[in-house]
Design a protein with these regions (language model features):
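Carbohydrate-associated surface elements
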Residues: 41, 160, 180
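Conserved donor-binding/catalytic core segment of Leloir-type glycosyltransferases
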Residues: 155, 206-231
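N-terminal subdomain of nucleotide-sugar transferases
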Residues: 1-55, 374, 384, 394-395
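Short alpha-helical donor nucleotide-sugar binding micro-motif in glycosyltransferases
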Residues: 148, 271-274, 281-286
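Short hydrophobic beta-strand element within catalytic cores of glycosyltransferases
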Residues: 311-316
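Nucleotide-activated donor-binding/catalytic signature segment of Leloir-type glycosyltransferases, i.e.
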Residues: 254-273
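Conserved acidic donor-binding segment of nucleotide-sugar-dependent glycosyltransferases
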Residues: 327-339, 347-353
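Aromatic "clamp/platform" in nucleotide-sugar-dependent glycosyltransferases that forms part
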Residues: 294
Length: 396
């Protein structure tokens, strides 16, 4: 099958969508499919294809994290996509490149698959002042309803995506395809004891201290402020448990000040942004992954931590019900309150080495089917369904 993946950002940028698209591309290529990635590139002034990637001219945007923003319409881009002769067009974002994918699918009479990766209601504060959030939400819902209705098939990494589409008036069912992780890169067998020791030395963490980490971009939607508040209310220095916040973002300064104001700055480490290829020893040097975020659909950072053996403590999410990623007693625990979070942290800290080894093995086992092959298989089945259901298209 010939598949065109449309994404606003791609390597060398790193975010959840980029990671998902890269793993999907790798899995599809391994299965013998042909893949073209169509992406914005603010470093070029003309369209060109290299190594299976169609680079599209774009303008660098400070508002969108320094990524490129491309025009949705380009005859040259359409011609290059047409030359690829795609059987399926699969869009992963909703802006210039995503709209370009919708336009190309319509012009070329190709089935369109649309993956919703982000709960955009949680991100509207980036583009609209507080007093206009209600209006912005309505406009956003109208826009995403158009996108959803344009697609032949919808996918999303968690049941929360189905809830969102139903809320905005899209009647189609969502094919839930969990996110994937590069299992080999995060295997604890490939991370040396020296690299793990170096992490603790760098941040002056004693050997008897347990480290709970959160990994992600530091924006309000990640609820790290809630995590800090929970920490201040329930964890003391005598617990010998530290919180390591790995990542950078627009509210990092606010969070660092919050930790000081709460009097917990001696128990909290802010590493700032860390290159993705340097992340494996960061995860492996910690003991547990903890998050209070309710905005994630299916956290790739959490999966990466689990691939290194980190049990997860996650705040209960009524919409997501967490059933797709965290299973109590198998690979982590769901908490409903700061007290429950603290109790689980202390319980894990007090496990014997044998008990901890069994738990870590269970965590790793739980993500063994979360690699590139599984993602490609799930997605290929959706492509087959889209081709069967689309007019003027023959299933391959």
């Amino acid at each position: 099958m010939r598949i065109a993946l449309f994404t606003e950002t791609y390597l060398p940028h790193i975010n959840g969508v980029v990671t998902h698209v890269k793993i999907l591309r790798d899995g599809l290529l391994q299965q013998g499919h042909e893949v073209l990635v169509v992406t914005a590139d603010y470093q070029t002034r003309q369209h060109y294809v290299k190594d299976g990637i169609l680079h599209c001219p774009a303008i660098k945007s400070k508002r969108f994290y320094g990524y490129g923003v491309a025009s949705p319409f380009s005859r040259r881009r359409l011609k290059l996509v047409q030359d690829f002769r795609p059987d399926i067009i699969h869009i992963h974002n909703e802006f210039g490149i995503g709209l370009s994918g919708i336009f190309a699918a319509k012009q070329l009479h190709v089935p369109l698959v649309y993956t919703l990766h982000t709960m955009y209601d949680d991100y509207l504060y980036y583009v609209a002042p507080r007093h206009l959030l209600r209006v912005a939400k309505k406009i956003s819902h109208d826009y995403f309803r158009l996108l959803g209705n344009a697609a032949t098939e919808l996918t999303g990494p968690s049941p929360k995506c189905q809830e969102y589409f139903q809320q905005i008036g899209v009647k189609k069912a969502v094919n839930v395809i969990p996110n994937a992780v590069e299992l080999d890169d995060f295997s604890p067998d490939r991370i040396s004891a020296e690299n793990k020791s170096a992490f603790r030395r760098r941040y002056h963490i004693p050997d008897d201290v347990m480290v709970a980490c959160f990994v992600g971009r530091l924006g309000h939607e990640k609820s790290v402020d809630v995590l800090l508040d929970y920490w201040a209310r329930t964890i003391t220095p005598e617990d010998r448990i530290m919180l390591c916040i790995i990542g950078g973002g627009p509210v990092q300064g606010e969070l660092e000040q919050q930790a000081k104001d709460l009097g917990i700055d001696s128990m909290v480490i802010f590493t700032g942004a860390v290159p993705h290829d340097q992340m494996p020893p960061y995860y492996a040097s910690c003991d547990v992954y903890v998050t209070a975020s309710l905005s994630d659909t299916n956290s790739i950072s959490m999966l990466e931590g689990m691939a290194t053996g980190l049990p997860v403590l996650r705040r209960y999410d009524a919409l997501n019900e967490n059933v797709d990623q965290v299973r109590n007693g198998v690979n982590g625990y769901i908490f409903n309150s700061p007290e429950e979070m603290a109790a689980e942290l202390r319980r894990i800290k007090n496990l014997s080495p044998e008990q901890l080894s069994i738990l870590k093995a269970s965590v790793i086992e739980s993500v063994k089917r979360s690699g590139a092959e599984a993602l490609a298989n799930y997605t290929y089945n959706v492509y087959r369904k889209a081709m069967a259901n689309a007019p003027n298209s023959k299933e391959k």
